[in-house]
């Protein structure tokens, strides 16, 4: 008979978040989840409701942490704050270890089809948060309000592209180059307003 392991729920979900973030959903079996998180198969079923529910709980944890992050809060500091958001995201000295895997939510969207409502709900939360933060800052910063909607979408797309670039390369340099270019573009919007 195997020994049961007690693991604190918060630590278990954090470990699951890191595991799913780095490995994805489909490639993980319950044995690997058990070995790397300390969550027994029994606990996986009875406490978390199975692998998919644990995955969704881990994704919720990621989104909660993102909502509270200083990096996301930097967007509120005008065009310079937005530029720094991108530059910080690609800076390996500023990045959380899991961040080298790109964006957990973007990785999830690439792995799953669009017909899973629980994943779509979390994607909507993520995109809504990004759009609102970018749009609010642009609305407060740009004189020409007709550019806010289009530039908001450019920034959301740039966020996705940067995260894909970070995930795709073992070395940080391509992401850093891209982030710096995005930062320069955002700063130029302020110069356009003054011209």
Where are the regions that the model predicts?
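Short, basic, alpha-helical segments at the C-terminal edge of helix-turn-helix-like DNA-binding modules
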Residues: 60-66
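Amphipathic alpha-helical segments used for helix-helix packing
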Residues: 96-121
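Amphipathic C-terminal alpha-helical segment
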Residues: 92, 136, 156-174, 185-194
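N-terminal intrinsically disordered/low-complexity leader segments
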Residues: 1-7, 190-195
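Amphipathic alpha-helical packing segments from all-alpha helical-bundle domains
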Residues: 80-83, 115-140, 150-153, 180-184
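Hydrophobic alpha-helical segments that form the core
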Residues: 101-110, 146-165, 177-185
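Helix-turn-helix
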Residues: 11, 15, 19-53, 57
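Hydrophobic alpha-helical connector segments
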Residues: 57, 71-100, 151-155
């Amino acid at each position: 008979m195997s020994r049961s392991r007690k693991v604190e729920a918060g630590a278990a979900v954090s470990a699951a978040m890191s595991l799913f973030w780095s490995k994805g959903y489909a490639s993980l079996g319950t044995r690997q989840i058990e070995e790397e998180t300390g969550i027994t198969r029994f606990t996986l079923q009875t406490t978390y409701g199975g692998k998919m529910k644990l995955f969704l709980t881990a994704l919720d944890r990621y989104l909660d942490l993102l909502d509270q992050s200083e990096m996301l809060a930097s967007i509120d500091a005008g065009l310079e704050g937005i530029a720094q958001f991108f530059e910080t995201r690609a800076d390996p000295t500023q990045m959380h270890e899991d961040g080298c895997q790109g964006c957990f939510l973007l990785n999830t969207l690439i792995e799953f089809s669009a017909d899973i409502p629980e994943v779509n709900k979390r994607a909507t939360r993520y995109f809504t948060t990004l759009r609102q933060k970018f749009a609010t800052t642009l609305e407060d910063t740009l004189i020409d309000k007709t550019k806010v909607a289009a530039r908001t979408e450019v920034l959301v797309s740039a966020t996705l592209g940067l995260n894909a670039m970070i995930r795709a390369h073992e070395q940080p340099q391509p992401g850093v180059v891209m982030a710096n270019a995005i930062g320069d573009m955002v700063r130029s919007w302020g110069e356009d307003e003054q011209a």
